[in-house]
Regions:
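N-terminal Rossmann NAD(P)H-binding glycine-rich loop of SDR-like oxidoreductase domains
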Residues: 17, 25
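Rossmann-fold cofactor-recognition segment
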Residues: 46-59
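Conserved NAD(P)H cofactor-binding loop of Rossmann-fold oxidoreductase domains
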Residues: 79-87, 218-219
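Substrate-binding pocket helix/loop in short-chain dehydrogenase/reductase
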Residues: 89-90, 97-99
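A short, exposed helix-loop element centered on a Lys and neighboring polar residues
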Residues: 113-114, 160
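Catalytic loop of short-chain dehydrogenase/reductase
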Residues: 127-154, 159-160, 164-167, 180
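C-terminal helical subdomain
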Residues: 168-171, 175, 187-222
Length: 223
C-alpha cells in the first residue's frame, strides 16, 4: 500500500473501533491519513484518534456533540461502517426495533453524509464510503431480515444520489455490500475483514470510481 496515498487527509471512520471499520482505519493511517475513529469500544491503536460514542444508546444525538461536529466539518475522508444487524421475520418485529434499525442503518449514515458535505464542497475534494448489506444494490425479498435489508437498500439510493449530485465538487461516494465475515453458510462464502477494507481503500483512492455499489460476497445470493 502506498504510504503517502492520503498524506495528511483528515479521515473519520464511524464504527472504526472494531471489525471492518478498524481495518479501514488502520489502512488509511498506513497510507498517511490522520484518522479519527468513533465507536463504543476504546481503541488501543496508537496511530488512531479515538472519539468514544455509543450509537446504540445515543443514536443521532451523538452527532450533535461539539467534538463530533468539529471533526465532521473538517473531514476529508469519511467511512461509515457502523450498522447493527437484526435477523427477524416481519411479524416478530416490534415498533421499537423498526425505529432502531431505521435510525441506525439509514438515518445515521445519511445524517453523517449531510454533515460532511458542506466542508468537502468548500474544499472541492472529498471521499465518502458507505456500507450496504449483502446484495442490497436492488430491491429484492429477504425472508428473515427485511428491516435491515430495507434500510441498507436505502443506503444504495444515498450513494447513487450523492455521487451524481456532488461530483462537480470533486467528491466521490461509493459503497461496499459485504458478505459474511463470520458465520457464513459455507467456507466458500467467507470474506476477510482486511480484504473488504482493501476494497474500500481502492474505492476511496480513485477519483474515477464514483457511485459504485461493490458486492464483496464471493457470489452469495439471498434465498
Amino acid at each position: 500500500m502506498e504510504k503517502q496515498l492520503f498524506n495528511g487527509r483528515k479521515s473519520l471512520v464511524i464504527g472504526g473501533t472494531g471489525g471492518i471499520g478498524r481495518q479501514i482505519a488502520l489502512q488509511l493511517a498506513d497510507s498517511g491519513a490522520e484518522v479519527w475513529v468513533m465507536g463504543r469500544h476504546r481503541s488501543e491503536d496508537s496511530q488512531l484518534h479515538m472519539i468514544q460514542a455509543d450509537f446504540d444508546r445515543g443514536g443521532l444525538s451523538e452527532l450533535f456533540r461539539p467534538d463530533v461536529r468539529e471533526i465532521l466539518s473538517q473531514c476529508e475522508i469519511c467511512a461509515v461502517t457502523y450498522g447493527p444487524f437484526l435477523q427477524k421475520p416481519v411479524h416478530e418485529m416490534s415498533a421499537e426495533e423498526w425505529s432502531h434499525i431505521a435510525i441506525a442503518d439509514y438515518a445515521l449514515p445519511g445524517a453523517v453524509v449531510s454533515a460532511v458535505l458542506p466542508g468537502m464542497m468548500e474544499r472541492k475534494w472529498g471521499r465518502i464510503l458507505l456500507f450496504g448489506g449483502t446484495r442490497t444494490e436492488s430491491v429484492r425479498s429477504y425472508r428473515t431480515n427485511a428491516a435491515y435489508a430495507g434500510a441498507k437498500t436505502g443506503i444504495s439510493v444515498i450513494i447513487k444520489s450523492v455521487s451524481a449530485e456532488y461530483k462537480e465538487y470533486g467528491i466521490t461516494c461509493n459503497g461496499i455490500l459485504p458478505g459474511f465475515t463470520r458465520n457464513a453458510p459455507s467456507e466458500e462464502y467467507l470474506v476477510e475483514e482486511s480484504w473488504v477494507a482493501e476494497q474500500g481503500i481502492h474505492l476511496i483512492s480513485s477519483e474515477k470510481l464514483n457511485g459504485v455499489l461493490l458486492n464483496a460476497d464471493c457470489g452469495w445470493q439471498p434465498r
